[in-house]
Amino acid sequence: MVHDSTDDPDDTRVRKSRRGTALDAPPQETAPPDLDPATTGGDDEDDALLPDILEESGAVGEEPLASGHEAIERAVRLAPTSPGVYRMLNANADVLYVGKAKNVKKRLSNYARQSAPQPARILRMIAATVTVEIVSTNTETEALLLEANLIKQLRPRFNVQLRDDKSFPYILITGDHWAPQILKHRGAQTRPGRYFGPFASAGAVNRTITALQRAFLIRSCTDSFFESRSRPCLLYQIRRCAGPCTREIDFPGYTTLVREATDFLSGKSHAVKQELAGEMEKAANELEFETAALYRDRLAALSAIQSQQGINPRTVEEADVFAIHQEGGFSCVEVFFFRTGQNWGNRAYFPRAEKTFTPEEVLGSFLAQFYDDKPPPKNILLSHEIEESELLANALSIKAGHKIEVTAPKRGEKKELVAHALTNAREALGRKLADTATQGRLLDAMATTLSLPHAPKRIEVYDNSHIQGTNAVGAMIVAGPDGFVKNQYRKFNIKSEGLTPGDDYGMMREVLERRFKRLINPPEEGAKVKDDDFPQWPDLVIIDGGRGQLNAVREIFANLGLTQVSLMSVAKGPDRDAGRETLFMPEREAIKLEPRDPVLYFIQRLRDEAHRFVIGSHRKLRKKDIREAGLQEIPGIGPSRKRALLHHFGTLKEIERASIADLGKVPGVSAESARRIFEYFHPQPG
């Protein structure tokens, strides 16, 4: 979708049930991206997950079933005959199911009839129901939107759940500066400018922006960097920016470049390419071969964008295409995004649903949740007819302020797009099923090797990072039956003031106490939930270190009263060689595995992923401090050398990128000063 900036979208949120949340199972990190190979889809955001199947248990007992019917009958007596949303809750106040109805009393009466035949899934839900809560709405469309919002927030066990629900990135060409900037944008579209999207992934946006810079030479630097320039930056030298900061291009010329880029993203690619081709031919005829070569390179960059996009439909201007494939009790929904006649990528989703749900039921519930916080396009194309397509179209039309069509095309190019998406869904689910089976065997082997009571479903790995105690941060990663679950990674900025700089034990103590106290003492009803709140107990906790670190964590666990969580530490081998690690567990001898043991390789991957994540978190903190402090914090760098460095390189970012040799070329900067500057920007964190 292409549009100017808008007001903040409705940010209404519903409190999540503390007990009834079924959190996602993790993705396999090495799984092939669930993308059309011919598109610029989200290979770097492939966090699609396979959920646990909710297995059907045996026959439902007559007594709990009768009790559930009685609870629903009580609700029927008070239920309105108007539209609304109802929630079924169990004895722990967990939300089991969220539903909507045009006539709530009539819908609940269907559940209350004991003689009516019901699927086993519905009978289990009724048997667990203790109370029913009802919210009346003015219209059925309002009920549909509220139902989708509640399902996303409460994650009821018996509903279809959209789980990997990241916001989509857009390309923004700013409108609040005389020299507009091009950048990636997520979230509320409040900054003035033109927004182009959604794109399937950050990777798709980054590649497109890089190609657009080559084609249209639009700046990507921030306004503060722009204003501080005294000479063009490196991007100007490599022909990815026109250099408006130092007036290498005048205002009319830069405005023309911005207009061409906007036209290209708005679907006028053919006209833009024709214009550039005409300018190239004109320059060649006038023997301006260097200028002609510049136009040639710009045309090549535009062709590269279009070649990456794969399918670009002729008759579909704006649409999202949804195709669902089911196999082995799992569902995969593949989504393609088409805007301005261009393919802006695709993404695979693996919604959580009982295996008795039909493709139509899964897809219908998925769509309502998908567009709960996203602007819908004019056309939504489906692989299957859903029951309430007209109601969904009306609800989305009201929300968007323009007509939305929801159809399952039977012929023509739209049908071809759906068929292509269905092929991708089938292939993505096949890959994910294979990866899940492999991961399951690996976890079984891990349980056998480490003598765990069962194959771990949730593994948490902890690490911390700092430089002489500064910018100290701890981190936790999570893995399980499907690999790494990145949406449950957490970082912990170390807050304890009494810690000795570099006290790794103290940092780990703070991290673990903050993590597990949340599980031991859940927040009160209505309490604000913080980033490190998530109610799942791990089966195995892994830390980096030897027997000393293990004993320190055992003491922390003992003080917290934790006895049921398995604990292991991983000590690096001699010379930090991979494959020579030693594993330590409480009350056991040290464990040495063969270097080629798949379990050891898996443990190495877990440790390395935790290290990667914590180092990345540490570097973000350090870069923030560097931006705020500038060069003042570097020993021996006074005002005169600071001015010389900024005059030579232009910005702090360019100084950070410079090598020791480049730094040594600055007048007044000695070899020792160059080394100190380089080490300041490129430290080795602990």
Swiss-Prot record:
Q: Which GO terms describe its molecular function?
A: DNA binding; excinuclease ABC activity
Which keywords accompany this UniProt record?
A: Cytoplasm, DNA damage, DNA excision, DNA repair, Excision nuclease, SOS response
Quote the SMART domains the UniProt record gives: GIYc, HhH1
Where does the GIY-YIG domain start and stop, copy by copy?
Answer: 81-160
User: Where mainly found?
Assistant: cytoplasm
**Any matching Pfam family:** UVR
Compartments where found:
Cytoplasm
> Could you tell me the superkingdom of the organism this chain comes from?
Bacteria
Q: Where is the composition biased (Basic and acidic residues)?
A: 1-14
- UniProt record, GO biological process: DNA damage response; nucleotide-excision repair; SOS response
GO (cellular component) term, any one: cytoplasm
Annotated segments matching region Disordered: 1-48
Question: What are the UVR domain coordinates in residue numbering?
Answer: 270-305
The annotated subunit structure for this chain is: Interacts with UvrB in an incision complex.
Which family, according to UniProt? Belongs to the UvrC family.
Record function comment: The UvrABC repair system catalyzes the recognition and processing of DNA lesions. UvrC both incises the 5' and 3' sides of the lesion. The N-terminal half is responsible for the 3' incision and the C-terminal half is responsible for the 5' incision.
Task: Report the protein name in the record.
Answer: UvrABC system protein C
Organism encoding this protein: Bradyrhizobium diazoefficiens (strain JCM 10833 / BCRC 13528 / IAM 13628 / NBRC 14792 / USDA 110)
From the UniProt record, report the name of the gene that encodes this protein. uvrC
